[in-house]
Amino acid sequence: RDVLGSRGLGDVYKRQHLRECGIFLIIKKHPLQSGWSLNEGAYTNIRYVTEEMLQKSGIQLYELVGLMDGLISDYSSIAVDYMLLDRPLGYVLTDLESYRSTRGFVFEHPEEYMPGEKIYNLEDLKDYFSHIAVGEDPFKEERRRLLPAMHTMPKKSGYCEALAEYLNIK
């Protein structure tokens, strides 16, 4: 499962490829995750952040997300929100079956609602980074197709009126 964590040769491989692609990777682990090294000085192009670090800096997670060229997630709702930015998404699915059997999904076939690269191993991760580095976005059309199913899109004008109507205050 630990495609993004630091584990021996895979970590060396990942760091080298990130440098070759000119990518700076920020990894924010879930509060319930453990076992990742937060050795900030060990990497030149990877930083691990926690919710506590963001709070101490006065930064909201979504402020950081808005600056990102791409997002790698698993089954988190942040990926659904990130679709609104129309930027590349990658999904780490190394524990898909165990997640399905223990926690379950809202959708019967969740992969159909993941408009981005499916990452099962380091090679898939390398492909995702390579696409980001050269500006390729192979899932752009899939995101656009899924966007209306995942988000109620506002009108081009009349936002306030639509909101008032929705809230029954008009």
Which role does the model predict for each range below?
Residues 59-60, 124:
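Short acidic active-site motifs
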Residues 42-44, 77-151:
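Catalytic binding pocket for nucleotide-activated donors in carbohydrate/polymer assembly enzymes
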Residues 51-56, 94-98:
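Short, acidic/turn-prone active-site loops that include or flank metal/cofactor-
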Residues 2-13:
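Single conserved hydrophobic/aromatic residue that forms the stacking wall/gate
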Residues 14-55:
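Catalytic donor nucleotide-activated moiety binding site of glycosyltransferases and closely related
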Residues 155-170:
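C-terminal alpha-helical cap of glycosyltransferases
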Residues 63-76:
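Acidic donor-binding loop of glycosyltransferase active sites
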